[in-house]
């Protein structure tokens, strides 16, 4: 870039016409291309959030009101979602009641479907993702999840929702959210 500027100032005179202007533009474009290529090849590592040991009792509970097939479907969904590394708690809610709790359990046995966060997610049928749950005022809406959960996702499906808790902030990638969405949709189909 410095050579192009020096060439323009000293060698081209006060007014550069035609060929000189085109050559200068090509030189600037080539230089910018090299700079952008170099920047695109820089290996940048994102800093992972600190993993937190979730406080709560470990366990699994399936509602006794479910049929054998529905209980099997609920266990399948929880197992599929728990394959995501950072997911430590899965809570399934369907037809007005909590049908499964698995992993590190929160203090409340039931999903509070009347809380603003859950009722909004169920009404609008759009996932609600809180990547930094400790910074969210609606933290109290997640009593069914461990108190020190770092991230949470509510994924609605027809008649219910899946709620998950993670052990670090910003833990769920778009791919993880898509996987939970597919599992929730299939669970909704099986339970209906």
Where are these regions (language model features)?
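Canonical alpha-helical transmembrane segments of integral membrane proteins
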Residues: 1-8
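Membrane-interfacial hairpin junctions
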Residues: 8-23
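Juxtadomain coupling helices with adjacent low-complexity linkers
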Residues: 161-192
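Transmembrane alpha-helices and immediately adjacent membrane-cytoplasm interface residues
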Residues: 22-50
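Short hydrophobic alpha-helical segments used for membrane anchoring or interfacial signaling
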Residues: 89-98
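Amphipathic alpha-helical regulatory segments at dimerization interfaces
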Residues: 75-90, 119-124, 143, 186, ...
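Regulatory sensory and allosteric helical modules in signal-transduction proteins
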Residues: 97-153
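Short regulatory/linker helices and ligand/cofactor-binding micro-motifs at input modules
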Residues: 56-71
């Amino acid at each position: 870039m410095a050579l192009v500027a020096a060439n323009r100032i000293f060698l081209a005179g006060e007014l550069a016409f035609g060929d000189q202007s085109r050559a200068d533009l090509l030189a600037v474009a080539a230089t910018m291309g090299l700079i952008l290529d170099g920047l695109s090849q820089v290996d940048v590592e994102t800093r992972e959030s600190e993993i937190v040991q979730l406080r709560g009792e470990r366990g699994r509970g399936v509602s006794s009101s479910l049929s054998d097939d529905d209980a099997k479907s609920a266990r399948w969904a929880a197992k599929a979602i728990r394959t995501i590394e950072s997911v430590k708690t899965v809570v399934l809610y369907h037809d007005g009641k909590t049908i499964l709790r698995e992993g590190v359990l929160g203090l409340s046995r039931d999903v509070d479907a009347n809380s603003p966060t859950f009722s909004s997610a169920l009404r609008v049928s759009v996932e609600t993702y809180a990547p930094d749950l400790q910074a969210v005022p609606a933290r109290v809406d997640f009593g069914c999840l461990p108190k020190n959960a770092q991230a949470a996702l509510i994924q609605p499906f027809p008649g219910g929702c899946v709620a998950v808790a993670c052990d670090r902030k910003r833990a769920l990638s778009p791919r993880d959210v898509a996987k939970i969405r597919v599992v929730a949709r299939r669970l909704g189909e099986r339970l209906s």
